Every structure is written in structure tokens, then in C-alpha cells.
Curated annotation (Swiss-Prot):
PROSITE patterns: IF5A_HYPUSINE (PS00302). Keywords: Hypusine, Initiation factor, Protein biosynthesis. Translation factor that promotes translation elongation and termination, particularly upon ribosome stalling at specific amino acid sequence contexts. Binds between the exit (E) and peptidyl (P) site of the ribosome and promotes rescue of stalled ribosome: specifically required for efficient translation of polyproline-containing peptides as well as other motifs that stall the ribosome. Acts as a ribosome quality control (RQC) cofactor by joining the RQC complex to facilitate peptidyl transfer during CAT tailing step. Gene3D superfamilies: 2.30.30.30, Nucleic acid-binding proteins. This is Eukaryotic translation initiation factor 5A-1. There are at least two genes for eIF-5A in tobacco: 5A1 may regulate the light-dependent translation of specific transcripts while 5A2 may be a housekeeping protein. It comes from Nicotiana tabacum. Belongs to the eIF-5A family. PANTHER family: TRANSLATION INITIATION FACTOR 5A FAMILY MEMBER. The keyword NADP does not apply. SUPFAM superfamilies: Nucleic acid-binding proteins (SSF50249), Translation proteins SH3-like domain (SSF50104).
Length: 159
């Protein structure tokens, strides 16, 4: 075997899992859950009693944290569900490009240029208007399961 036969795919993450298991019976309202491979925020949980043949079941109603779609799932309360690692990070807004991407300043001084402006009209208007007025804006970015989206805005004051 020569050295040339060893090719390894480089991945962006260091093997860190995008989700972790949690027993269905312990997931509460306002928690997070993966339904149909989408990260969701739980808005309603109801539990049914154990039947003649089976486990108690948890009925989850949840909203996709990126698309806002309502999803539902029913899981036996003793089974494990996938729970996404959801992070919120604040970045300072530096620039908005013509093609709808934002340029953000990270904590360590690098720029992050791979995020689009949000699709939410109210948030989009706040960002564009605030930037046009020259305000110092900090954007909250939510990330889960390899996806990122701008989800909030803070006005730090004039530049």
C-alpha cells in the first residue's frame, strides 16, 4: 500500500453530535425536540395513561425553530427522543451586502459572511432601517443541527 491510497474526508465539525438523547417523558414545554429531522421548540406536551397493551405516550406539538412550521409527534414516554443542541450567539452587524447577506463581527475579531438576512418581515425591516440610520446593531443568531438563522436584534446605540 502506498501513501497515496489514504484519502480522508475533512469535515467541518470535530465529530460533535448535533443532537443528544433525552427520555420523552422528561421533555417539557419550551424545551427542544427533533421531529421529522427538524429542530423544534415544544409548545404543548400531553401524556396519555398506559393502556392495556403498552406504554404511556407523550404527544408533542412543536414549532420548527427555523421555518415556523407546526409539527407533531407521539412517542412512548419511556423511549428516547433526539434533542438538538441549540445555541444563540450575538454578533455585531458590520455590513449588509446587495445580495442579501450580512457581514457580522465575531467575538474574536473575525468576520462571518455566510448568513442571509432573515425572512421575517418585521425583523428584516428593523435590521435594514437601523443599519440605514447608522445605529450600532447586535444580531442574535440561532444555530442548531448545522443550520443558522438571524432571530433577534439589539440596538446598542448610535455609532
Amino acid at each position: 500500500m502506498s501513501d497515496e491510497e489514504h484519502h480522508f474526508e475533512s469535515k467541518a465539525d470535530a465529530g460533535a453530535s448535533k443532537t443528544y438523547p433525552q427520555q420523552a417523558g422528561t421533555i417539557r414545554k419550551n424545551g427542544h425536540i427533533v421531529i421529522k429531522n427538524r429542530p423544534c421548540k415544544v409548545v404543548e406536551v400531553s401524556t396519555s395513561k398506559t393502556g392495556k397493551h403498552g406504554h404511556a405516550k407523550c404527544h408533542f406539538v412543536a414549532i420548527d425553530i427555523f421555518t415556523g412550521k407546526k409539527l407533531e409527534d407521539i412517542v412512548p414516554s419511556s423511549h428516547n427522543c433526539d434533542v438538538p443542541h441549540v445555541n444563540r450567539t450575538d454578533y455585531q452587524l458590520i455590513d449588509i451586502s446587495e445580495d442579501g447577506f450580512v457581514s457580522l463581527l465575531t467575538e474574536n475579531g473575525n468576520t462571518k459572511d455566510d448568513l442571509r438576512l432573515p425572512t421575517d418581515d418585521n425583523l428584516l425591516a428593523l435590521i435594514k432601517d437601523g443599519f440605514a440610520e447608522g445605529k450600532d446593531l447586535v444580531l442574535s443568531v440561532m444555530s442548531a443541527m448545522g443550520e443558522e438563522q438571524i432571530c433577534g436584534i439589539k440596538d446598542v446605540g448610535p455609532k
